[in-house]
């Protein structure tokens, strides 16, 4: 709708300006602007001496505010951050909002909820995050109530390079509908680059709620003051200077593990033990050169990166902005549509899912253009189908109390051969081969409330962290040493060889000597004829370990999810079953209760 001068208080120039501006605004921006103008109007009336009551007496009565419950299931903190942001924006729009982790929400309260927003990630092979497990199980069980009076919407987070993309969100969405719920707005599935789709989802939610008469069209006036403040974040990373970059493994090791120390001086960034650091890496320039050569593209050609119109030379864009080392089914589908390649279309034909899965595994963009190209498309067309470079999350290996203005990382270099070529981890090999002291890395802190030391410093802790999984426990120990925590601490560490792969060995020995660490058990799998892993050491001490659990100890696991964390989980169940004289079902309930009490926490990948 065009604003006309004849039916408005604006002159011709003002009307033209507004007609150019309004179509470019999103729904949430319009809502914010409405609240801002309302606040300005009230302020002007008060400054002129007009009582606020007189102003409100002439205004129409605001719509009755309705309650909205926002539940999140989050493993690394992304879903939690989006849920909290949604809560703030809803409050500014006049809603009464409760934001909660699914693990803290009492399922028997669900029947009382009128408007429900679900923000949830998918973990591992299509599984819910740890703090969503109990709610997911309840909702899919026999005790789930009928929800005919519920209105809901789901924001699903995932990674399209995995087979079960956004599976948990899809399951919540389907189940809530089966129980009688009606959608406020359609489910939105987000890939790694989730900012824009998440914002569009929230716009749809606000529109749906407001159309139902649930909230005011304007946010609270306080929103008007929330401008001009900027902090370093995932969308505005801080360039941290590299202070140290050392190889932790000894000569002759099969592994290369980097200890990287970064300066946070001047950033204002803070973190707690258990948090992660997001790092935006760059692609290997050699791989980019091969890709440019294969496609016969001009490296200096200017390409547009985003809807905002930011531009870069093609080579720079491929190095720093786009993901080129991972193939996904959506990427293949877009490439087939863009290029019209018959062979690629044949690969993607219905019923050919297993072949697609096999092709994607271990291949990158260079493989795609070599196998099915070169494509007769422009560089701009091709980069438009690529995902933005995702950040890599690393468990922080330091305590801010012990290392002011610094953050330390423990990064395992990834190298392997596949499909006739050497493959390299994007971020890990940047750190191993190209990153020097004095260089900078774009970083941000990812807070993780699902992996935190006990509030009571006297609570015993049991830590299981083989390989680079040791990182957060170095942070835990530094923090406990700084604060003088007196609770018992037991560490299980494992790797290949004692001589070359005992990461931070001297530090662990000093903590043992000083009493900061009570016990440490290690497993070096290649030093014995029969491979020994951390779960074997746990079984050897099953009676004492169960005693610690009975005393209220908190258990922390960090590292590989697919094998190690799965095996350790089953070992814990075995120990509880054996030492507690329980059935398997009782042991599972015991561990689930620990998880509910935040005494069983995992940082797995």
UniProtKB/Swiss-Prot annotation:
It holds the Pfam family NAD_binding_1. Its cofactor is FAD; FMN. This is Sulfite reductase [NADPH] flavoprotein alpha-component. FAD binds at residues 392-395. NADP(+) binds at residues 495, 525-533. The keyword Oxidoreductase applies. Its EC number is 1.8.1.2. Alpha(8)-beta(8). The alpha component is a flavoprotein, the beta component is a hemoprotein. Induction: Up-regulated by sulfate and the transcriptional regulator CysL. Pathway: Sulfur metabolism; hydrogen sulfide biosynthesis; hydrogen sulfide from sulfite (NADPH route): step 1/1. Disruption phenotype: Cells lacking the cysIJ genes are unable to use sulfate, sulfite or butanesulfonate as sole sulfur source, grow poorly with sulfide, but can still grow with thiosulfate, cysteine or methionine. Transmembrane segments: none annotated. It catalyses: hydrogen sulfide + 3 NADP(+) + 3 H2O = sulfite + 3 NADPH + 4 H(+). GO terms for cellular component: cytosol.
